C-alpha cells in the first residue's frame, strides 16, 4: 500500500509537471478525489482501449492514468505507459524513462537503466526540455555503475 501511495504521488507530480492533459469531469468540484478525476465509464474505457490498440498515443496515456490513479494496477499502468511512449507521446516517453530509472526498492523489479536512457533519449529528441537534464543524470549514473563494476569484478 505504501508503494502504491508513493507511486500515486510521484506520477501525480510528474503528470502535472509535464503538462499531462487531464480534464476534470463536468459537474465535479475541484475537491473531488484524484480517483474520481481519472475515472472512466465502461463505455469510455472501451473506446479508449480501441483507440489505444489502433495507435492513439493520447488514448494510451489516458489509460495509463486511469490504471495509475483509480485502479492501482501497476502492470496495466506500465503496459499503457510503454504503449503511449512507443506511439510517440513525449510525456509518456519521459515518464517511462523516469519509472525505469527509479531506485525505490519496491519497484526494483522494473529498474532498467539502459531502457530508461533509451526512452529518455526519445523524449529529448522529441523536444522534452526536462528530459535533457534527466538524461545527463542517467548517463552519469551509468558511468558510475561501470566504474563500480570495474573496481569490483
Swiss-Prot record:
<keyword id="KW-0732">Signal</keyword>
<protein>
    <recommendedName>
        <fullName>Uncharacterized protein YibG</fullName>
    </recommendedName>
</protein>
<dbReference type="InterPro" id="IPR011990">
    <property type="entry name" value="TPR-like_helical_dom_sf"/>
</dbReference>
<feature type="signal peptide">
    <location>
        <begin position="1"/>
        <end position="19"/>
    </location>
</feature>
Amino acid at each position: 500500500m505504501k508503494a502504491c501511495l508513493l507511486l500515486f504521488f510521484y506520477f501525480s507530480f510528474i503528470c502535472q509537471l509535464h503538462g499531462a492533459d487531464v480534464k476534470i469531469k463536468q459537474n465535479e468540484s475541484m475537491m473531488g478525489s484524484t480517483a474520481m478525476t481519472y475515472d472512466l465509464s465502461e463505455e469510455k474505457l472501451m473506446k479508449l482501449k480501441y483507440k489505444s490498440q489502433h495507435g492513439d498515443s493520447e488514448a494510451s496515456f489516458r489509460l495509463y492514468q486511469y490504471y495509475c490513479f483509480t485502479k492501482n494496477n501497476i502492470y496495466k499502468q506500465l503496459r499503457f505507459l510503454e504503449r503511449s511512449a512507443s506511439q510517440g507521446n513525449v510525456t509518456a516517453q519521459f515518464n517511462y524513462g523516469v519509472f525505469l530509472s527509479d531506485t525505490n526498492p519496491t519497484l526494483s523489479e522494473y529498474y532498467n537503466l539502459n531502457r530508461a536512457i533509451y526512452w529518455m533519449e526519445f523524449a529529448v529528441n522529441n523536444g522534452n526540455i526536462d528530459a535533457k537534464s534527466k538524461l545527463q543524470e542517467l548517463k552519469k549514473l551509468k558511468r558510475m555503475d561501470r566504474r563500480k563494476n570495474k573496481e569490483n569484478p
